[in-house]
């Protein structure tokens, strides 16, 4: 006779048998971790995220390794592989010089590559939600780094939170940087230039051909990037071969019309000749030079890249995009002016203190270890470094506009003014101009002004809301369980992720439903933008309009002035006063118009 205890034991045993026999759901099957692409099968891995999982495929090859005779050439399509490729860890990073300015300092070390350096580096990563979606929106990340550095394997670019929370598929790719990615003999197929951009383009072609197998929608692809990554995104908007490869674009703190982004072909060729000279490859013809440069160890090329430009030049890019007649047929501002741009929706934005990240890398009087309270002389020396080749008159115009015109002069004013000069000229004003031109062509555009300084930022307080430090909120790092962001920052990051994903899915940051602050479309006339911070977002118009008008209209005229310096100086100062008075009147009238319009709307 069975006891009650025996019956209970048998019942428990049967329950365990049933549990073991039950299917655990599709997310736990081998089928979900192995996906067949056009070039072969890849095996991913399951990642725990926020109480759930995502499936990650890390280090999928998308091109032949650009080794030997393929160095300096466009990327070549991949051959099929017979076995299953293990895509379970990040691949090599592309060769690049490491930032050693502040050894051991997290603020700079976080951007250095965290995998082995190799020319065999053309790999991409895919994060997909669980359960595996059908026809999900795809977001493809392009990293920044001035076209000299960067890798997709950095923790700050981890796509798992975005995939898990917003149920989008996230993709990122490595592309060649520095001379190995952008050395150019324009017109020569053995070293045409823009190889790094062609890498990106081939990765986007891979996404088009394969993303459906991962549950993605090839007709809903948003490319997004920061700094040189944003400039890359805007170059794809100007490249007809890239048009079919994506749907929408997000540009964070960068654009291709910025003064650092694209070089004229003559300048690109001259820099290649200079590198050839320093590596002992000065030869009679281009092919001999290319052959010699291909024979060099990549480390030797890296060592000599830094000699291509003067040692005191800051914010200069040794090797970057150029007009090659193929990927890029003209300078970006010309193509924008001619309306030769993809019809699409774009989301663009900048951070409050874009210039500070560059000042600590050599500007006189600046340091990450103090308050960088600089003198007038150091401000002027800083202008000399950031504007080499600009006449004394041109630099005097900048000094007068950003400092003297305000009347107040103190170390803080000089420090903050140089931050504004560098940020306005290189990031903010070009981004606004790109957005304005894009909007003039009847494309929907949206603009943001990022105002939140991360509580975990290792850089000093005076550096403010720095270049690059919105990225951690876009990728959801504050949601991690073992991080010490504030609760407000976690909420803010979720809001940013929702906004970016809404834009990717629907072409509008508000998505299909309204929220507390409706994000207005940016038009070339009103130029409305939204502030992003942990408080309530606000709508404003004409971000830094007087400063950007100075760089767009007044500064070029000053550079053209010749003749007697005293007479010319008097002439530009008089012209400047007339111009600034006009700008102030215009700003006041516009503000009056805006307030009256909003009052009428509220009735």
UniProtKB/Swiss-Prot annotation:
Pfam families: AChE_tetra (PF08674), COesterase (PF00135). It comes from the Eukaryota. Glycans are attached at residues 86, 135, 270, 370, 484, 510, 515. GO terms for molecular function: acetylcholinesterase activity; choline binding; cholinesterase activity; identical protein binding. It catalyses: an acylcholine + H2O = a carboxylate + choline + H(+). Residues 1-29 form the signal peptide. InterPro entries: AB_hydrolase_fold, AChE-related_enzymes, AChE_tetra, CarbesteraseB, Carboxylesterase_B_AS, Carboxylesterase_B_CS, Cholinesterase. Disruption phenotype: No visible phenotype; due to the presence of other cholinesterases. Hypersensitive to acetylcholinesterase inhibitors, such as huperzine and donepezil. Treatment with the acetylcholinesterase inhibitor donepezil causes convulsions and death within 3 hours of dosing. Belongs to the type-B carboxylesterase/lipase family. PANTHER family: ACETYLCHOLINESTERASE, CHOLINESTERASE. This is Cholinesterase.
């Amino acid at each position: 006779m069975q006891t009650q205890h025996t019956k209970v034991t048998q019942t428990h045993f049967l329950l365990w048998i049933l549990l073991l026999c039950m299917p655990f759901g599709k997310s736990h099957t081998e089928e979900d971790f192995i996906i067949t692409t056009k070039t072969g099968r890849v095996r991913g891995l399951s990642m725990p995220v926020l109480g759930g999982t995502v499936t990650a495929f890390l280090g999928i090859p998308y091109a032949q390794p650009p080794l030997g005779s393929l160095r300096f050439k466009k990327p070549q399509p991949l051959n099929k592989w017979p076995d299953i490729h293990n895509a379970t860890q990040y691949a090599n990073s592309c060769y690049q010089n490491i930032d050693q300015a502040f050894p051991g300092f997290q603020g700079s070390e976080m951007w250095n590559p965290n995998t082995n350096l190799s020319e065999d580096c053309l790999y991409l990563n895919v994060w997909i939600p669980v359960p595996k979606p059908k026809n999900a929106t795809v977001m493809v990340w392009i990293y920044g780094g001035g076209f000299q550095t960067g890798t997709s394997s950095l923790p700050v670019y981890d796509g798992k939170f975005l995939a898990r929370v917003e149920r989008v598929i996230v993709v990122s790719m490595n592309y060649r940087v520095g001379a190995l990615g952008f050395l150019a003999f324009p017109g020569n197929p053995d070293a045409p230039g823009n190889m790094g951009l062609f890498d990106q383009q081939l990765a986007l072609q891979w996404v088009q051909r394969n993303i459906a197998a991962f549950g993605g929608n090839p007709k809903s692809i948003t490319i997004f990037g920061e700094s040189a990554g944003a400039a890359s995104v805007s170059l794809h908007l100007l490249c007809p071969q890239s048009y079919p490869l994506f749907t929408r674009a997000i540009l964070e703190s960068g654009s291709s019309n910025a003064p650092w982004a694209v070089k004229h072909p003559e300048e690109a060729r001259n820099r290649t000749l200079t590198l050839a000279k320093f590596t002992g490859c000065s030869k009679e013809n281009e092919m001999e030079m290319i052959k010699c440069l291909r024979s060099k160890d990549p480390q030797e090329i890296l060592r000599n890249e830094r000699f291509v430009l003067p040692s005191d030049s800051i914010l200069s890019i040794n090797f970057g995009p150029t007009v090659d007649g193929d990927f890029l047929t003209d300078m970006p501002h010309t193509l924008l002016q001619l309306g030769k741009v993809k019809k699409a929706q774009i989301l663009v934005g900048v951070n409050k203190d874009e210039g500070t990240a560059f000042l600590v890398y050599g500007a006189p009087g600046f340091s990450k270890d103090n308050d960088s309270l600089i003198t007038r002389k150091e401000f002027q020396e800083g202008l000399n470094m950031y504007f080499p080749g600009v006449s004394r008159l041109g630099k005097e115009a900048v000094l007068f506009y950003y400092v003297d015109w305000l009347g107040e002069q103190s170390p803080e004013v000089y420090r903050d003014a140089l931050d504004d000069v560098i940020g306005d000229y290189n990031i903010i004003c070009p981004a606004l101009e790109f957005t304005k031109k894009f909007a003039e062509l009847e494309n929907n555009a949206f603009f943001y002004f990022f105002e939140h300084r991360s509580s975990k930022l290792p850089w000093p307080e005076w550096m403010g809301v720095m270049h690059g430090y919105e990225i951690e909120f876009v990728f959801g790092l504050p949601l991690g369980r073992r991080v010490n962001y504030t609760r407000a920052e976690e909420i803010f990051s979720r809001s940013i992720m929702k906004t970016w994903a809404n834009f990717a899915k629907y072409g509008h940051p508000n998505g299909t439903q309204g929220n507390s602050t409706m994000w207005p479309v940016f038009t070339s006339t009103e130029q409305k933008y939204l502030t992003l911070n942990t408080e309530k977002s606000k709508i404003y118009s004409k971000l830094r309009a007087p400063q950007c008008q100075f760089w767009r209209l007044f500064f070029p005229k000053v550079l053209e002035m010749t003749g007697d310096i005293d007479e010319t100086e008097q002439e530009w100062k008089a012209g400047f006063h007339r111009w600034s008075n006009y700008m102030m009147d215009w700003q006041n009238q516009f503000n009056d118009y805006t307030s009256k319009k909003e009052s009428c709307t509220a009735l």
